[in-house]
Amino acid sequence: MANVIWRGPVHLAQPDSRTLKTGASILPGLAVTVTAGVFQLAATSKVDYFIMHNRAYIGETVDTAVPSGETGEAFKPVPQYEFNVRFAAATYAPGAVLSIASGQLKAAVTGEVAVAVFDEAASRAISANGLGDVRILANSYVVPA
């Protein structure tokens, strides 16, 4: 299901979402936050974040960015739900703990806030802004030394 952002089964309710204008061109699957009433890329995972959704209702795919100044929709992450998100370039192993940097999920390091885990069956190299599955953690935490 690489063509969707929320990867839940049909028997679960779709996560709550927020609809706002974007302050920049934003690809679906990137982590965003609300700043001055518009969606902006989440700089870190130390913020209240959302996951940008594709505008399927007008026929756009996960590869179509929401242009700056246009209305976009973003999901509020739900613990244990799976999302298809954008990653920083690296190789990720199943269960790898992830944080946010510039809207992308990346391997969390000491002192960062962990928000999700890599939830694919095997390790995989992902290019910058490539999509991959994550499971949202029930409780975020600061990665210890």
Regions found by a protein language model. Give the residues of each.
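Surface-exposed, low-hydrophobicity beta-strand/loop segments enriched in small/polar/acidic residues
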Residues: 1-145
